């Protein structure tokens, strides 16, 4: 009877050992296939490339923000080589723009979809520095640069006669320019 128990345990442990080996082999094959597929991709995705570019820009600014060579004004937020003022005060689009100009900045100009990532917690809408130029039939930023193609789809359904508001969660709205909303100023450091 004792020999039977020993033999049964040996048989069970042998079967379990074989199952473990098969599972480890399968895991190895899956891991190898996963790594191979990643290395076959032609290049980084646009989002990864953008994230890399932002990281490079951030690295170039590490020595600047707060070190004395560049610093943001009081109540302004430093982020990726820029200073941002996020208002709590409600103003018309023009009054918001005038405030920004008086502080050597402009209403927010969004250059990438991820630019205002530092304020994703907010649910408010803010005036930004984009308006429709009737003469050129194009959306222009305050510096007269055109709206980038990757941002253009967000502006298809807005009324060109209105001013543009942005929500940090990625929503774009238009509103009568004389309405009062919060606004965001942006000052480029570099």
Curated annotation (Swiss-Prot):
CDD domains: CLECT_NK_receptors_like. Residues 79-186 form the C-type lectin domain. It comes from the Eukaryota. It is found in: Cell membrane. Glycans are attached at residues 104, 144. Disulfide bonds join 69-81, 72-83, 100-185, 163-177. Keywords: Adaptive immunity, Cell membrane, Disulfide bond, Glycoprotein, Immunity, Innate immunity, Lectin, Membrane, Receptor, Signal-anchor, Transmembrane, Transmembrane helix. Changing residue 168 to S: In allele CD94-03. It is a single-pass type II membrane protein. GO terms for biological process: adaptive immune response; innate immune response; negative regulation of natural killer cell mediated cytotoxicity; negative regulation of T cell mediated cytotoxicity; positive regulation of natural killer cell mediated cytotoxicity; stimulatory C-type lectin receptor signaling pathway. One of its GO terms (cellular component) is plasma membrane. Residues 1-10 are cytoplasmic. The chain crosses the membrane at residues 11-31. Residues 32-190 are extracellular. One of its GO terms (molecular function) is carbohydrate binding. InterPro entries: C-type_lectin-like, C-type_lectin-like/link_sf, CTDL_fold, NKG2/CD94_NK_receptors, NKR-like_CTLD. Immune receptor involved in self-nonself discrimination. In complex with KLRC1 or KLRC2 on cytotoxic and regulatory lymphocyte subsets, recognizes non-classical major histocompatibility (MHC) class Ib molecule MHC-E loaded with self-peptides derived from the signal sequence of classical MHC class Ia and non-classical MHC class Ib molecules. Enables cytotoxic cells to monitor the expression of MHC class I molecules in healthy cells and to tolerate self. Primarily functions as a ligand binding subunit as it lacks the capacity to signal. PANTHER family: C-TYPE LECTIN PROTEINS, NATURAL KILLER CELLS ANTIGEN CD94. Can form disulfide-bonded heterodimer with NKG2 family members KLRC1 and KLRC2. KLRD1-KLRC1 heterodimer interacts with peptide-bound MHC-E-B2M heterotrimeric complex. KLRD1 plays a prominent role in directly interacting with MHC-E. KLRD1-KLRC1 interacts with much higher affinity with peptide-bound MHC-E-B2M than KLRD1-KLRC2. Interacts with the adapter protein TYROBP/DAP12; this interaction is required for cell surface expression and cell activation. This is Natural killer cells antigen CD94. It comes from Bos taurus. The gene is KLRD1.
């Amino acid at each position: 009877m004792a020999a039977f128990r020993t033999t049964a345990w040996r048989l069970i442990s042998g079967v379990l050992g074989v199952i473990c080996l098969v599972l480890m082999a399968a895991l190895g094959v899956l891991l190898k296939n996963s790594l191979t597929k990643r290395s076959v991709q032609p290049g980084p995705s646009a989002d990864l490339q953008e994230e890399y570019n932002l990281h490079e820009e951030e690295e170039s600014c590490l020595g600047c923000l707060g070190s004395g060579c560049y610093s943001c004004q009081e109540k302004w937020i430093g982020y990726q080589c820029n200073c941002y003022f996020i208002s709590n005060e409600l103003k018309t689009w023009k009054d918001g723009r005038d405030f920004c100009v008086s502080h050597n900045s402009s209403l927010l100009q969004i250059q990438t979809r991820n630019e205002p990532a530092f304020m994703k917690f907010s649910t408010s809408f803010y005036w930004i520095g984009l308006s429709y130029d009737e003469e050129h039939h194009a959306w222009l930023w305050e510096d007269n640069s055109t709206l980038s193609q990757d941002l253009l789809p967000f502006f298809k359904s807005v009324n060109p006669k209105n001013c543009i508001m942005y929500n940090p969660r990625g929503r774009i709205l238009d509103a009568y320019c004389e309405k009062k909303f919060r606004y965001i100023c942006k000052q480029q450091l570099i």
